[in-house]
Design a protein with these regions (language model features):
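An acidic-aromatic substrate-binding cleft motif
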Residues: 93-172
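Carbohydrate-binding surface patches
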Residues: 385-423, 465-466
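Catalytic cores of secreted or luminal carbohydrate-active enzymes
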Residues: 336-380
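Aromatic- and carboxylate-enriched substrate-binding clefts and catalytic-loop regions
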Residues: 175-334
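Solvent-exposed beta-strand/loop surfaces of large extracellular or lumenal domains
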Residues: 13, 18-25, 431-452
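C-terminal beta-strand-rich structural cap/linker in extracellular carbohydrate-active enzymes
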Residues: 447-472
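N-terminal accessory beta-strand-rich subdomains and adjacent acidic, glycine-rich linkers
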Residues: 1-122
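Conserved, mostly hydrophobic/aromatic
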Residues: 165, 268, 344, 402
């Protein structure tokens, strides 16, 4: 295959939202009128178009990549776009199967976030490794690396996070980049990992290990020994990092890594990966992937009011939310905006970037610790507008959560009806609102409410709102 001539034509009066970080999907989302996009510009193929004033939303992307490189879009000008196989030259395919090229058209933001075509176009699971897959368990994970990268190099600190994860009620603890420094040799480091796992098991906490894609995992004998060792030690999952590619080889490696991990009952998350293309339907142990401008790129309220309607259409995103103690990452957003991110961005492996003891000291553990990572029901509520405000309601069993992102543009006041709650039921609402004069402050109240009630909410620029409703 030398090229792919597939083209997409979009009316020039639409608004295009796109980003240009093709390697890892961490660029800031840009907004331009489609007719103003310069010819030759290349951007990631999770691009959204909005018809102003018409409530019509279009997404162009792909799904079910197998033995094929990933695609981007090249602007040809005047609303015309061409498939760009940006990370490859000529290549060969066997069997002639190409990925699905997807154009979704939706009439509302709520309809847009419920469009599962990216996932459903991918091949369903068909592998014996996933029979009796009770080892695939979603959950929250403690993570020391974000607060201080040196923490992962200190065995005692990761052991401390075992205890913190237990106290917070998290299912997992992630030992990130640096665990091999626990000893002079990798063999010695694995012995320390076994100590970590033994301690974690006593606390009903599972251990995940970090692994770089730039290391020896390309080498099949090493990779198989690595997986076998992890299974023997009792590791629950692997975080594969530093991928940054959409070559034919790499898109196949995603599949190979997930398949071989499943043979050893290991879950997987991918960091710095390609765009999401429905991989989890084929390989259910792929719990999440980054491919998002998350908290490691510092909080960005304007970007947050776009990503739920672009990136999140591809499924789970490891945004790594909730860190309040690293000022450069908190940036200008409020505490309530950060709490809202934990509800709006979903991930079956949910990496909590803050020290659990700090969340507890700030009185936020009652919201974060019981927070679900899998939802029964989700709604985008009226008043949401891409690039300005996002209003979500989610249900997990008999609990509802509401979350709001405000952009950085201005202070905003809204009335939020609780009509998403079950009629006739009473709820205890735990409500978090912005302190309008203090970015790091927040107001917390508990009140009894029903579906007939509502809340008047005032938000700072880059502010937000979060609430949990427990049926009583």
């Amino acid at each position: 295959v030398a090229d792919e001539p597939t083209q997409f034509n979009v009316p020039g009066d639409t608004v295009c939202r796109y980003q240009t970080d093709l390697k890892k999907m961490q660029g800031k989302t840009l907004t331009k009128k489609t007719s103003a996009l310069p010819s030759g510009e290349i951007f990631s193929c999770m691009t959204a178009f909005e018809f102003p004033g018409k409530s019509i939303y279009i997404m162009v992307t792909e799904s079910d990549i197998e033995n094929y490189p990933g695609m981007a879009l090249r602007s040809l000008g005047a609303g015309r776009f061409k498939t760009e196989l940006w990370d490859t030259d000529k290549f060969f395919i066997k069997g002639g199967k190409t990925p699905w090229r997807i154009v979704t058209v939706c009439r509302s933001l709520d309809q847009l976030i419920h469009c599962r075509v990216i996932t459903l176009a991918a091949a369903p699971v068909n592998d014996k490794a996933y029979e009796n897959a009770d080892w695939i368990r979603p959950g929250k994970s403690a993570w020391s690396y974000f607060i201080d990268e040196e923490h992962s190099r200190r065995f005692e600190k990761i052991m401390e996070f075992n205890a913190l994860a237990q106290e917070a009620g998290y299912e997992y603890n992630l030992a990130d980049n640096g665990w091999r420094d626990w000893a002079k040799t990798e063999r010695g480091a694995f012995k320390k990992v076994k100590e970590l796992v033994n301690d974690a098991e006593k606390r009903s906490v599972g251990i995940w290990l970090w692994q770089s894609a730039m290391d020896k995992v390309w080498f099949t004998p090493y990779r198989r020994r690595f997986f076998k060792k992890c299974e023997k030690l009792g590791i629950k999952g692997i975080k594969l990092d530093h991928i940054e590619s959409e070559t034919q080889f790499m898109t196949e490696f995603y599949r190979l890594f997930a398949r071989e991990a499943a043979e050893h009952k290991l879950m997987v998350i991918y960091h710095n990966p390609q765009k999401p293309t429905g991989l989890r339907r084929t390989f259910p142990n792929v719990m999440s992937m980054e491919a998002i401008r998350g908290l490691q790129c510092k909080a960005d309220a304007d970007n947050d009011t776009i990503l739920p309607f672009t990136r999140m259409l591809g499924g789970n995103a490891d945004y790594t939310p909730l860190c309040f103690s690293v000022p450069r990452c908190l940036n200008e957003v409020s505490i309530c905006h950060m709490l809202a991110s934990a509800v709006i961005y979903n991930s079956a492996f949910f990496t909590v970037s803050e020290d659990p003891s700090i969340l507890k000291a700030h009185g936020l553990d009652s919201f974060v610790s019981p927070l679900p990572v899998v939802w029964n029901e989700t709604h985008v509520l009226p008043g949401s507008k891409i690039g300005e405000i996002v209003i979500f309601a989610r249900r997990s069993e008999n609990k509802w959560y509401a979350a709001v992102f405000n952009s950085a543009q201005s202070e905003r006041k809204i009335n939020l009806p609780f009509s998403f709650l079950k009629d006739g039921a009473k709820y205890e609402a735990e409500i978090y609102t912005d302190n309008l004069t203090d970015q790091r402050g927040y107001n917390k109240v508990k009140i009894s409410v029903t579906s007939a009630d509502s809340a008047d909410i005032a938000m700072r620029p880059s502010g937000g709102f979060a609430a949990v409703f427990r049926e009583i």
